[in-house]
C-alpha cells in the first residue's frame, strides 16, 4: 500500500514542531512491512524539517503538488515564472495584504506588507531554525518562488487580489489566510503522478491529513484518515478520524487498519 502523509498538524505538531517518536517509528515499520510511505505537504521541498527528511520516505510531494520527487528523481518541479512576480508584488501592496513568498531555500518577505501579522514572524522563526534564509523582496529575488501565502489584516481586500492573480493561481482559503498554488496543482494531482510512476491503483492508497489543503488528497485516496486535531472539513472528508498528533494518532490509525 502507498500511504501519504501531510507534515504540519499530521506528522508533526504544528505549534510545538514536535515529531512524536511513535510517528517516526511507524514510518520505519511501514517500510519494513513492504508499504510505501510518501510525504504530501504544502511546504516546498527545501523547507522540510531535517527530522522528517531523515525518515525513510520513498517519495516527496511538496508545495501542494508543484514539486514531486520519487527517490532521487524529480517527476515535477514547477516554480512561479519570474515575469509574474512584479504584478503579484504590486497587487499584494495595493490590496493591503500581508505576504510570505515561499522560495527555494527560504522566504522572501515584503517590508511593511509582511510585518503586521503574527503568524509571519512565527513561520519566519521556524524556517530560520532549520537553516533556511529570510530575506526581503527589495533585496532581489535570487531564488525562484515556489508558492506564496497571503494573510488578512484590517483593510485587506483579498477578493480584489484574487481577481488579479486567478489567471495563474488557484487559491486555497485557510481561515484568514490564503495559499496560492499554480493552476492545475493540488496534493491529489501530485499523488497521482507518484501512483502513475509506480503503477499503483488508487484503491491501494491511504492518506493522513488535517487541514483544508489536504482535502483533495483525502478525497482522492482509497482510505482517508484525519487527525483528531484536524479541521471539521477534513474530518468530514475522512473515512476514519484518529487521535491527535500528540496522542500518537499516526500509530493508532495504522494499527486500527492492521498495517502495523
Which residues does each predicted region cover?
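Active-site phosphate-binding/coordination module
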Residues: 18-117
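Phosphate- and divalent-cation-binding pockets in alpha/beta enzyme and binding domains
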Residues: 47-50, 160, 190, 216-217, ...
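Short, structured coil segments at secondary-structure junctions
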Residues: 55-56, 64, 164-168, 220-221, ...
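Short hydrophobic/aromatic-enriched beta-strand-loop microsegments
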Residues: 57-64, 170-173, 224-228, 242-243
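Short, flexible loop segments at the rims of nucleotide/cofactor-binding pockets, characterized by
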Residues: 14-17, 37-39, 77-78, 126, ...
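Asp-based phosphoryl-transfer active-site loop
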Residues: 1-16
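Conserved acidic, metal-coordinating active-site core of Asp-based
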Residues: 91, 95-208, 212-220, 229
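Asp-based, Mg2+/Mn2+-dependent phosphohydrolase catalytic module
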Residues: 220, 224, 228-260
Amino acid at each position: 500500500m502507498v500511504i501519504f502523509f501531510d507534515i504540519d498538524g499530521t506528522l508533526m505538531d504544528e505549534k510545538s514542531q514536535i515529531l512524536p517518536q511513535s510517528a517516526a517509528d511507524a514510518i520505519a515499520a511501514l517500510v519494513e512491512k513492504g508499504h510505501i510511505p510518501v510525504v504530501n505537504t504544502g511546504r516546498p521541498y527545501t523547507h522540510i524539517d531535517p527530522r522528517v527528511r531523515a525518515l525513510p520516505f520513498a517519495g516527496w510531494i511538496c508545495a501542494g503538488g508543484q514539486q514531486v520527487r520519487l527517490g532521487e528523481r524529480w517527476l515535477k518541479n514547477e516554480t512561479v515564472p519570474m515575469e509574474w512576480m512584479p504584478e503579484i508584488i504590486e497587487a499584494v501592496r495595493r490590496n493591503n495584504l500581508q505576504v510570505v513568498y515561499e522560495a527555494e531555500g527560504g522566504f522572501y518577505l515584503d517590508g511593511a506588507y509582511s510585518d503586521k501579522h503574527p503568524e509571519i514572524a512565527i513561520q519566519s522563526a521556524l524556517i530560520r531554525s532549520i537553516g533556511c534564509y529570510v530575506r526581503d523582496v527589495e533585496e532581489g529575488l535570487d531564488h525562484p518562488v515556489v508558492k506564496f501565502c497571503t494573510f488578512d489584516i484590517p483593510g485587506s481586500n483579498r477578493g480584489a487580489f484574487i481577481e488579479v492573480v486567478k489567471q495563474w493561481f488557484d487559491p486555497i482559503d485557510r481561515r484568514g489566510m490564503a495559499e496560492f498554488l499554480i493552476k492545475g496543482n493540488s496534493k491529489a494531482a501530485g499523488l497521482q503522478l507518484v501512483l502513475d510512476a509506480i503503477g499503483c491503483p488508487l484503491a491501494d492508497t491511504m492518506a493522513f491529513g488535517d487541514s483544508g489543503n489536504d482535502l483533495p488528497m483525502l478525497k482522492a485516496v482509497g482510505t482517508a484518515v484525519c487527525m483528531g486535531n484536524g479541521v471539521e472539513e477534513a474530518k468530514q472528508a475522512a473515512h476514519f478520524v484518529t487521535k491527535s498528533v500528540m496522542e500518537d494518532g499516526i500509530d493508532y490509525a495504522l494499527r486500527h487498519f492492521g498495517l502495523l
